[in-house]
Amino acid sequence: MLKLLRNNGINKLKSNLIRNYSTKQSIFQALDTFPKRHIGPNENEINEMLKSINTSKLSKKNPNSLEQLIEYTIPKDIRLNRELNIEENKVIGENQLLKDLKKIAEKNKVYRSFIGMGYYGTITPHVIQRNILENPGWYTPYTPYQAEISQGRLESLLNFQTMVSEFTGLPMSNASLLDEATAAAEAMQMCVNISKSKGPFAFLVDKYCHPQTIDTIKTRAEPKGIRIEVVDSKDFKFTEDVVGCIVQYPSSNGVITDYKEMADRAHQANALVVAATDLLSLALLKPPGEWGADIALGNSQRFGVPLGFGGPHAAFFSTKDKYARLLPGRIIGVSKDKQGNSAFRMALQTREQHIRREKATSNICTSQALLANMSAMYAVYHGQQGIKDIANAVHRKAIILAEGIKRLGYTVLDRPFFDTVLIITGDKTDMMIKELESRQINVRQYCSKSISISLDETVTSADISALLNGFSAHASKPLGLSSPEQLEKETSTISVISEEFARQTPFLTHPIFNRYHSEHELLRYIHKLQKKDLGLTTAMIPLGSCTMKLNATTEMYPVSWPEFNSIHPFVPANQSLGYKEMFESISNMLCEVTGFDGCSLQPNAGSQGEYAGLMVIRSYLTSIGQSQRNVCLIPVSAHGTNPASAAMVGMKVVVVDCDTNGNIDVADLKAKAEKHKDTLAALMITYPSTHGVFEEGANDICDIIHANGGQVYMDGANMNAQVGLCRPGDIGADVCHLNLHKTFCIPHGGGGPGMGPICVKSHLAPFLPGHSVVKGVGGERAMSAVSAGPWGSSSILPITYVYLKLMGGQGLKKATQVAILNANYMASRLKDHYKILYTGSHGLVAHEFIIDLRMFKESAGIEAEDVAKRLQDMNFHGPTMSWPVPNTLMIEPTESESKYELDRLCDALILIREEIREIETGKADRKNNVLVNSPHTEKVIVADNWNYPYSRSKAAFPTPATVASKFWPTVGRIDNVHGDKNLVCSCPPLSDYQ
């Protein structure tokens, strides 16, 4: 009987298991699906959080559900009433998607490319690839605004600045810009700003600059009314209106030119000289600063950063000390902390757009930190002698190639060169290019009668042989010597860089560049710096308007595939079919997400997306005979890049007021739109608002602008609250940029890379940016380029592709719902301790919210900075400080954070509120307390002397999580004023590192 019962029980259990499983899914359905990994809270936690918010008090319909939460958060008239159609919209596992993407990637042909033009093959040291590029400890941190927990990458970026300054011979460098072409455009604007003239302005461009650089300069100049003259530099005429000029050094055709006489003439006419240059060549060539350049810029890509089909790469930019305050981009400087220790920080931040808005030096608010750090580590690893050896090897290989080609009967341009050989091919040009392509070799067709070949550190003897064999197929003479090794011996005494061009000054002299040349030493240095920085590997980073969500390993994985990262951006179209397929897929998915009709992937950052979007609007208005429209309405709450971008495209900024609830004052908007109805070009609006609320009447706001002849530009900074729930195009916007490094999972990289593609309505699509080198990019009436690369930072687009495909329409919607849930859950937990500054009509927030700290300045002498620094003691990065409202904190948790992590931050903030109360009640001293003295470093805690009126444990281990695992700020609170008054922007003495 017992046996019978047991068998019956087993059979029943089997039956239930089979029945339960079969009702859920097929056994062939993927089990490694992504949404459950990307979204932090599980279903039980979601239900628990919904109950704590208790939306059922608003309605009994769908009580305490995500649907009900959204119903009372997003206005009904803009909600999307269908699922997003993300292509096939099928559930797919992570493993299978990578297999599918690999098949697409394999449609790209990885040929040997000797095209040059600012992009070169390079060897990324594996220790740098694995431990920086592929390391979440380096790619997940945010921009180092919280310097005390960012000392590692700040040190590395200071190394980058020092490297650039020493190579270029100019003492002041920034921490990188987006690409060489946009850096050149920034240099032009800097020349205008330095001139202090009211115009008119002219800028001279050497015709031997890279064509993509010339194109981008023209784009930037046109709306500002700057006259551009493209001529040979020897024909530069420095008339009274000329504020500056730019030359390529070495030239795009490879020639090394002596520019000293030209620079002297420029300075006599009060014009500045800009040199677009190549870092590796400067190991052998006289630095631009020594022959008279005032500004030097270029691409640091060949210092260990893969080609990536155009990016991302870190541009460099250096100038003279006296122009420091007009330098675009971020500058890393040295200051002191509260204990007098040397500390790194971002210097001269008052130049930036979040403070100076339309009067800022530039609209760029990001850099290429991750790539700059790779290039800096490349220099640290190789040092002066290593870089010289690489440069000499590249140069000697170019000499060998030139000699071999001469012996085949071809004419080689007889001018000094570094790495680029220009061959006169006459009527054989097309034939030669096809011949070489048949041998899987790409070269540059310089013009109809010549070919140029640019060599790099990856070139082997076999590559030289392949090139010579290719040329021998159509040579007038037989190949006398087939061995590059023999040519090496016979050309050993040939030098094409004369003494007048040769570098005499040392570089990379600081000990930091002479210590870490073994892999063990560099590995330890990289990890030593990494441990100083708080990234998403340590804790959530709750920065409002920054969307610090998961950067999943599966998303990052394809970035290192050679099919994506080893392709030159200017290869023939038939060699990049995989990229083409992926670009089209991403563009279609982004258009579906936003409700638009056209997409450009070219802008390299959100700021560039704003600039591109406004330029598209400007091009459209000009096409319909409305070029007089130049007024841009911008709410007072807007991010500083908005007015800075509007100013860049020649628009006049008119500020629109906000009401007491933080919403756009519709009456003021209507009045100003009607006042400027004949000149209104655009409204720039962020949605949901920068105050973290879905404003009512967004459709009406768009209608007001359209009724008065303007276009609506929507800033996509807060798109993480819209995806799958509402769409900018449906709301009434005409153009929107998307921060792929926020909403669509590209990592922030400690301050870049970013990507800011734009999506547009059909009437604007014809004007999407094109490219001077690669045809077929952009719309039918394409404006000129806004970036160096045709598709921006192409090699990080697989990250967004993988995210969109793995999430699908339902997953994307769920992610947005949970992002809004997480913010509302935190707000509900904190509302009894802090004032939540803005909420919607139902008391709910969007995906972020602001806590008000203004009252504590009077009651306890505590400000937002004190709370943010105290959070560092509790293993957290502080939220966004004092923006958009002074002395507040804006918190954005994102959908990727678990309930555990949300509670940990809430508990920390509640504990801080108790610490403030201790000051308010007199229990703690107003000027000597745990908040104003924060953060507390390990060095302070273990010191023999302890002169604080609270315990060491309260200072450093205030929460259970800090007892279990402690992240230590490396330095105490930094003296920003001291750093700006005593500006030091290159590596300090070695003793400061120890």
Curated annotation (Swiss-Prot):
Range of the transit peptide: 1-21
Gene Ontology CC terms: glycine cleavage complex; mitochondrion
UniProt subcellular location: Mitochondrion
Positions of disulphide bridges: none
This protein's UniProt keywords: Mitochondrion, Oxidoreductase, Pyridoxal phosphate, Transit peptide
One example GO MF annotation: glycine binding
Keyword Oxidoreductase appears in the UniProt entry: yes
Family: Belongs to the GcvP family.
Oligomeric and partner information: Homodimer. The glycine cleavage system is composed of four proteins: P, T, L and H.
Protein name per the record: Glycine dehydrogenase (decarboxylating), mitochondrial
Organism from which the protein derives: Dictyostelium discoideum (Social amoeba)
